Amino acid sequence: MTELTQQASWQALEKHSKSLPHMRELFSTEPERFGNMSTQACGLFLDYSKNRASQETMSLLFNLAKDSQLESKIKAMFAGHVINNTEQRAVLHTALRAPADKVINVDGNNIVAEVQQTLAKMGEFVESLTSGQWKGYTGKTITDVVSIGIGGSFLGPKIVSQALRPYWTGELNCHFVANVDGTSITEKLKGLDPQTTLFVMSSKSFGTQETLTNTLTAKEWFLSQGASQSDVAKHFVAVSSNVSKATEFGIDANNIFPMWDWVGGRYSLWSAIGLPIALLIGMDNFRQLLAGAHEMDEHFANTPLESNMPVIMGMFSLWYGNFFNAQSHVVLTYDHYLRGLPAYFQQLDMESNGKSVTLNGTDVDYSTGPIIWGGEGTNGQHAYHQLLHQGTALIPADFIMPLNSHNPVGEHHVQLASNCFGQTQALMQGRTFDEALAELNQSGLAEEQKLLIAKHKVMPGNKPSNTILMDKLTPSTLGSLIALYEHRTFVQGAIWQINSFDQWGVELGKQLGNDVLERLVADTEAKELDSSSNGLINLFKQGKI
């Protein structure tokens, strides 16, 4: 047993998990359950009453958090301590949205001042582009921006831009490219005019394979349309810490925005990586996005555990994963603009907490990061919700919905809300055999057939969910929501005693991918690797099966 599983608070939860009544009973015996098990902060309302939890459960979960020194770990992150111990780095994405008068020192430098300088530079750049002052090589204004990145430098900007579609200023179109598949960039470039297109290349090293390959292809396309190397500076900018490589490529040093080691890619949308967002929604709205996230930072850092929204959500996820063997967690967004959030939270959580050793290198003997997946309501109700209701696996769910729509057409939004709330009720309540049979009594079916169908219509219920509401989707509430999930991810990693801020599995994939690439482009037959890899490489070289 590891240190964590030996804790009395952990073992108390193990024992307690076997004695909880069905949620139906909890609701029937606790008339004030909704009021007692809901909270609000930072423009968000969280109903966590539809969880397998009593007041005793909550006390035991908070005891585990306290025994795991969660509060001191939260303070250590905000203070800039080196909590990413494998890479010897501070973890300070929170500094990206801190107010200008805040002082956070890393290696003797106030990084908040650096962040503010970068935000000012971003503002000037956004203004020059959206006002039409920035001209392309033929004197035309820029109409289209192509953002090239991968991982956090792609997914965050894309999903946030999509979510904030109602706030686009309309001056620019933005296109996102990540996959190294040539089809991706080829399709994006179709219909674009090189005279009015600007590329934003995001790579800390300016050498990430997929990003560099796509950027080189974009440059070849640009030059093939009649532009010259000297024109590159008017159509390419970079977010990178490798200034020399970027300038060698042809990018003006003044148009290179910084990245810092104390920000991981999946936490970087708040930095200059978010430049495409700012270009679409304007700098004022981008600052509102940061302000919403900062408000959640303050809540997380200063609120007691018992009413701390990220702590509550993180502890529930751990509760189901470690004590009920839940292997996945579903995120269901009842707002079309938020349809990309499940994929964003998937990267955030799975890249952070997909770990199997503790900070000190001990193998864990408990489950860590679950599979995060999901989609858009109500589409999922006609697909995978069936598994949620009657499948054998326990899959906790998060339902996310604004109370007011940006597009209040007819009865659409009230129907959307009825589906959202109805699903949470059905998951909690289920349907007993007697209830199913009673519904069939007027069907005219033979008794034997009624008994059979009733068995198939039984739903166990007791399926947990959280419901997160906001008045309306705005830059501020979106910032709060994303920061909520960032900190929820931190809470789980802190309890599990793992490093949520490295990604050695990703790094190994890059390394082996480069090794395979060398063999794919070599003239000789591949023989050095395992028989499967050799066989696949040689089939690719043949170009046929």
UniProtKB/Swiss-Prot annotation:
EC number: 5.3.1.9
Active site, renumbered: 351, 382, 510
Family: Belongs to the GPI family.
Annotated SUPFAM superfamilies: SIS domain
Keywords (A to Z) from UniProt: Cytoplasm, Gluconeogenesis, Glycolysis, Isomerase
UniProt catalytic activity: alpha-D-glucose 6-phosphate = beta-D-fructose 6-phosphate
Name this polypeptide is given: Glucose-6-phosphate isomerase
Pathway assignment: Carbohydrate biosynthesis; gluconeogenesis; Carbohydrate degradation; glycolysis; D-glyceraldehyde 3-phosphate and glycerone phosphate from D-glucose: step 2/4
Organism classification: Bacteria, Pseudomonadati, Pseudomonadota, Gammaproteobacteria, Alteromonadales
Record localization: Cytoplasm
